[in-house]
């Protein structure tokens, strides 16, 4: 007979609050949101106005402010002007990512002109380059052929970026839902987006490259540039499967991914296998950047934009840091938070961005 059983039981009762407190101390709370330095590594502030950035100081957020070639050459020029001006005004809060135009693609010197343009943006402080889904999904050459990201004409540009150590943020392809009918899509935000943007709903365009062809073109480009620091925007368009994301990150050791506009797909998976998603985030904690894909137009009121951004930021913080059950707009059913340890959250929200964009956010 174990005469120490009452003593052991008593010790367990006394220790259990201490164990619980220790677990809580290893995780951030909702109150910690305003105490922890954070980077939104996928943001679009299309304005020279500093007010939004000043409002976000209370949230302890800094930004990678990204230019996108989505509206023509004139808009691209204006976006560069505002993005670089905002960086110059608040280099301690805003890092800049530039982009390039495909205008003049069929000319013999497109690559040289593009490199000169990008170098000019780097001289003004840009630390990364964004490539967008118009490559592979929209832009065609003079013969009417879609230009994929592994086209040889891009080779000198990517080789230059690789040599200079410039990060490339790539939104290539779309979420896998894009190739499914609306009723089969897994999350509401994809369903709503492709209902409004039928031109990108590839299920309706069977003559266009498949999802697999888009991913393969991206991977061939990375194989040609093994030392390129590539950040796969939107979970590298592999948002539907942590297994596939893991394979991608294992295959390309210089690649990272951001969470922008795809946390709903992560929640869809954690709703079905929470522990698997937690294990993925633990294993690849050094390769994941928090981002939202939030966009603020030049004519938007900073206070209104900040209120919308904070709502998103707080919801994501709750998901990653607590084990509370919550309603999210991307899903019809509630999802339980992941309650990640502080060490993992600090990397996803801050340390990885500081490491990947060296020299950023300094006065």
What name fits each language-model region?
Residues 23, 206, 210-220, 225-363:
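H/E-rich (His + Asp/Glu) clusters that bind or coordinate divalent metals
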Residues 55-56, 86, 121, 161, ...:
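Generic structural signal for hydrophobic
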Residues 22-93, 112-113:
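An N-terminally biased module of ancient metal coordination in phosphate/nucleic-acid-related enzymes
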Residues 1-9:
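Bacterial N-terminal signal peptides that target proteins for export
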Residues 11-21:
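Hydrophobic h-region of N-terminal signal peptides that target proteins for export
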Residues 25-31, 81-202, 206-209, 256, ...:
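Active-site gating/metal-coordination segments in enzymes
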Residues 42-50, 69-79, 103-112, 139, ...:
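Acidic-and-aromatic substrate-binding clefts and catalytic sites of carbohydrate-active enzymes
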Residues 39-43, 63-66, 94-98, 129-131, ...:
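Hydrophobic faces of well-ordered beta-strands that scaffold small-molecule active sites
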């Amino acid at each position: 007979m174990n005469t120490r059983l009452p003593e052991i039981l008593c010790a367990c009762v006394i220790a259990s609050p201490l164990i619980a407190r220790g677990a809580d101390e290893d995780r951030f709370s909702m109150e910690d949101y305003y105490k922890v330095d954070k980077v939104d590594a996928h943001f679009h502030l299309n304005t020279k106005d500093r007010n939004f950035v000043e409002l976000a100081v209370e949230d302890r957020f800094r930004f990678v402010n990204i230019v996108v070639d989505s509206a023509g050459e004139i808009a691209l020029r204006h976006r560069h002007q505002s993005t670089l001006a905002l960086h110059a005004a608040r280099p301690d809060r805003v890092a800049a990512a530039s982009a390039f135009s495909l205008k003049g693609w069929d000319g013999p010197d497109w690559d040289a002109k593009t490199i000169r343009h990008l170098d000019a943006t780097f001289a003004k402080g840009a630390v990364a380059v964004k490539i967008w889904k118009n490559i592979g999904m929209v832009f065609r050459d003079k013969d009417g052929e879609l230009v994929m990201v592994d086209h040889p004409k891009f080779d000198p540009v990517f080789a230059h970026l690789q040599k200079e150590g410039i990060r490339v943020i790539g939104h290539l392809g779309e979420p896998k839902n894009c190739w499914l009918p609306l009723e089969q899509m897994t999350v509401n935000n994809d369903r709503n987006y492709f209902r409004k943007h039928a031109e990108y709903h590839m299920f309706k365009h069977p003559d266009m490259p498949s999802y697999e062809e888009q991913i393969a073109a991206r991977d061939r480009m990375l194989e040609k540039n093994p030392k390129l620091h590539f950040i796969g925007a939107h979970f590298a368009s592999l948002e539907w499967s942590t297994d596939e994301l893991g394979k991608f990150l294992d295959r390309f050791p210089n690649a990272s991914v951001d969470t922008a506009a795809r946390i709903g797909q992560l929640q869809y998976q954690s709703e079905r296998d929470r522990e698997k998603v937690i294990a993925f985030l633990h294993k690849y904690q050094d390769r994941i950047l928090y981002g939202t894909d939030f966009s603020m137009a030049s004519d938007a009121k900073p206070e209104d934009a900040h209120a919308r951004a904070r709502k998103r930021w707080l919801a994501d913080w709750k998901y990653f840091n607590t084990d509370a059950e919550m309603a999210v707009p991307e899903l019809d059913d509630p999802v339980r938070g992941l309650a990640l340890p502080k060490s993992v959250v600090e990397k996803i929200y801050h340390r990885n961005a500081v490491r990947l964009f060296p020299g950023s956010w300094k006065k």
